[in-house]
C-alpha cells in the first residue's frame, strides 16, 4: 500500500494559482480584442516583457504573425537589451513556418536598418542574422560594415570577423 503525498499549504496555493492563471490565459485568448491587447502591451515598455512571454508561449495564426513579427523584429534589433532574448526566441520559433513570415518581414525592414548608420543597430542585426542563419542578409550587412567610413561601424565588422569568427 502506498501513501498519498502530503503537500504543504504553500504548494497547494501555487498549484491553484497556476490553474487559475491557465484558465485566465485561455479566457483572454478567446476575447474579441485579444490581438489589440497584445499589440498595446508590446508597445508599452512596462508590459512588453509579459507580452513577449505570451507570444513565445502561444500559437498564433499566420495573419496574426504578419502583424506581430515586424514589432518583434524591431524589439530584437533596437529594443531594450533585457528583452532581446525573448524577441529572438520568438523569431527563431517562427522562422521556419510554411509562409516564411520572419524572413519576408526582416528582408522588407532590412534596408531601413542599413540606412540607420547606427553601430548599435548593426551589432544587434548581425547577431540576429547569425542566430536565424540568414546568410544572404548577413553578407550584405558585413559588406556595409566593412566599407563604412564610420569607425564604429567598421568595428562591428571587425568584431564579427576577427573576434567571433563569423563570416
Q: Language-model features: where?
A:
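Amphipathic alpha-helical scaffolding segments comprising HEAT/armadillo-like alpha-solenoid repeats
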Residues: 29-39, 62-75, 97-112, 135-146, ...
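Alpha-helix N-cap/helix-start positions at coil->helix boundaries
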Residues: 45, 77-82, 115-120, 150-155
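Long, contiguous N-terminal structural blocks used for assembly/anchoring
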Residues: 1-75
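Eukaryotic acidic, Ser/Thr-rich intrinsically disordered low-complexity regions
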Residues: 2-14, 136-167
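Structural detector for internal amphipathic alpha-helices that build alpha-solenoid repeat scaffolds
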Residues: 12-27, 49-62, 85-98, 120-132, ...
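Short, local alpha-helical segments
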Residues: 106-113, 118-124
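Helix-adjacent hinge/juxtasegments
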Residues: 67-95
Amino acid at each position: 500500500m502506498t501513501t498519498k503525498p502530503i503537500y504543504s499549504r504553500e504548494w497547494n496555493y501555487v498549484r491553484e494559482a497556476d490553474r487559475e492563471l491557465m484558465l485566465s490565459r485561455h479566457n483572454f485568448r478567446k476575447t474579441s480584442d485579444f490581438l489589440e491587447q497584445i499589440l498595446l502591451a508590446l508597445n508599452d515598455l512596462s508590459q512588453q516583457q509579459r507580452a513577449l512571454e505570451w507570444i513565445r508561449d502561444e500559437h498564433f495564426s499566420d495573419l496574426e504573425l504578419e502583424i506581430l513579427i515586424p514589432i518583434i523584429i524591431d524589439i530584437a534589433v533596437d529594443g531594450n537589451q533585457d528583452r532581446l532574448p525573448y524577441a529572438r526566441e520568438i523569431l527563431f520559433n517562427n522562422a521556419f513556418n510554411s509562409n516564411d513570415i520572419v524572413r519576408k518581414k526582416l528582408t522588407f525592414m532590412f534596408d531601413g536598418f542599413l540606412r540607420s548608420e547606427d553601430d548599435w543597430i548593426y551589432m544587434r542585426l548581425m547577431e540576429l542574422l547569425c542566430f536565424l542563419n540568414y546568410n544572404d542578409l548577413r553578407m550584405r550587412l558585413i559588406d556595409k560594415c566593412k566599407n563604412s567610413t564610420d569607425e564604429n561601424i567598421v568595428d562591428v565588422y571587425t568584431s564579427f570577423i576577427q573576434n567571433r569568427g563569423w563570416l
